[in-house]
């Protein structure tokens, strides 16, 4: 009995590490997602592709392109032809940090096995965020991420497909006639 209990405990303790290993693969990762956000009474949704390679994260959908690398973020707003350059403070947490498990501020509360999946409960105390990451038990690949901030903001990300790939065709956009806003200080 003790051996079985210890095995369950050890396997649960590695679930978050398994998730991190999968999405932070040296090959890179391409994730097709459906993204839903509700803020007070307003709800929005979109579908897009998340590219992860080393410390670079890109999210692309029909309305925007977001690239995060080395603490700098570039957002291309396609419908209004606008580019915004900004930097992220070390204390800030991005949605990319949550999706990749790439931040020390993420605290793991529990790991629960449910229907051949593992639900990783987490919180980010400094931002009032609580959430869950659902992963496949076999390989640690994520299937769903849900988090809530202060009851007002809820984000639900369904992962439609995911693959580790050494090469991916990143989208390129001609922004020569776009308005540029530079917020980098």
Language model regions located:
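N-terminal leader/targeting segments and the immediate start of mature chains
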Residues: 3-43, 53-55, 174-185
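Short glycine/serine/proline-enriched coil/turn segments at secondary-structure junctions
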Residues: 39-42, 66-67, 125-127, 151
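Non-transmembrane domains of secretory- and envelope-associated proteins
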Residues: 114-116, 124-130, 138-185
């Amino acid at each position: 009995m003790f051996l079985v209990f210890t095995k369950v405990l050890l396997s649960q303790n590695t679930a978050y590490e398994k998730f991190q290993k999968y999405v932070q693969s040296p090959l890179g990762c391409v994730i097709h997602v459906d993204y839903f956000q509700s803020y007070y009474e307003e709800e929005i949704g979109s579908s897009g592709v998340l590219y992860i390679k080393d410390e670079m994260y890109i999210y692309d959908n029909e309305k925007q392109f977001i690239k995060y690398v080395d603490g700098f973020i570039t957002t291309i707003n396609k419908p209004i032809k606008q580019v915004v350059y900004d930097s992220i403070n070390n204390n800030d947490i991005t949605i990319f940090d949550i999706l990749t498990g790439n931040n020390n501020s993420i605290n793991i509360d529990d790991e629960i096995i449910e229907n051949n999946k593992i639900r990783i409960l987490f919180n980010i105390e400094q931002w009032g965020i609580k959430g869950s990451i659902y992963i496949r038990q076999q390989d640690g690949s994520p299937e769903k991420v849900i988090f809530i901030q202060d009851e007002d903001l809820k984000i639900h990300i369904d992962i439609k497909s995911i693959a580790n790939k050494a090469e991916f065709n990143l989208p390129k956009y001609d922004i020569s006639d776009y308005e540029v806003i530079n917020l980098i200080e």
